[in-house]
């Protein structure tokens, strides 16, 4: 049993390395700007970095509402030589999306019977917001079926839209998103691939880089908060100026 367990760990470690699985996933409640991304990229220990957009939406499959997680594929250089192509996809059937309005679906035995290449998935926000606030189009043609190392089990996770549980996952081009800020960042750590993913040495190495990123994030957070305050103040002044202008117009 012990030998079998070690073999499974070794196989999964090789799989993670082959498909460049992230070592760190970085989240922010206010999103990430290009300046934030540069700060993370320049942090000691960071090897590869992929800034991405992610949202949860709802759709109907065979008349039943389902929650779908929408993630992104890099727009270019999807090669094994690109260290920034993290969580690489393996194509089971079809091809990767090349333009807005195309997507691939993560392989799932359950949904594979319901969604096929050529089908069109129509998305809505599942709440009071408009899906166009996040995506440039609400319809996506399935052009491929893929495996991803990002999800190694059938459970994708929970969501605050739909029924609360994510049913399946699609990937679209990064340019399909309308949002200005990135929602999450994946990073790999220098020297991590040479270590066993399950070893203390691996966790120590990744932990050191994680702490340095957190320090850099604190500095960037202060700058972001000030930027948001400045934007709010600018809008406030603009509104006041418009009110005064309207008052003057009425007096005339």
Identify the residue ranges that each predicted region occupies.
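Basic-flanked hydrophobic alpha-helices used for secretion and membrane insertion
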Residues: 6-252
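A hydrophobic alpha-helix feature that marks transmembrane segments and, especially
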Residues: 2-3
């Amino acid at each position: 049993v012990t030998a079998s367990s070690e073999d499974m760990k070794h196989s999964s470690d090789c799989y993670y390395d082959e498909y460049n699985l992230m070592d760190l996933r970085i989240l922010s409640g206010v999103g990430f700007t290009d300046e934030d991304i540069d700060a993370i990229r320049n942090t000691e220990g960071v090897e590869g970095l992929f800034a991405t957009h992610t949202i949860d939406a709802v759709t109907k499959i065979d008349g039943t509402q389902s929650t779908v997680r929408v993630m992104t594929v890099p727009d270019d250089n999807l090669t094994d030589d690109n260290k920034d192509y993290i969580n690489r996809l393996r194509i089971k059937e079809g091809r990767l999306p090349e333009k807005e309005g195309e997507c691939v679906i993560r392989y799932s035995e359950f949904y594979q019977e319901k969604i096929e290449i050529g089908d069109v998935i129509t998305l809505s926000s599942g709440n009071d917001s408009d899906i166009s606030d996040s995506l440039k189009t609400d319809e996506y043609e399935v052009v491929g079926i893929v495996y991803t190392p990002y999800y190694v089990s059938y459970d994708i996770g929970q969501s605050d839209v739909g029924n609360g549980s994510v049913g399946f996952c699609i990937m679209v081009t990064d340019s399909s998103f309308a949002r200005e800020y990135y929602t999450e960042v994946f990073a790999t750590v220098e020297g991590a691939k040479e270590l066993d993913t399950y070893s203390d040495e691996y966790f120590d190495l990744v932990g050191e880089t994680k702490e340095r990123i957190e320090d850099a994030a604190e500095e960037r957070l202060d700058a972001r908060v000030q930027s948001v305050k400045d934007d709010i103040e600018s809008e406030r002044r603009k509104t006041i100026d418009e009110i005064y202008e309207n008052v003057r117009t009425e007096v005339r």
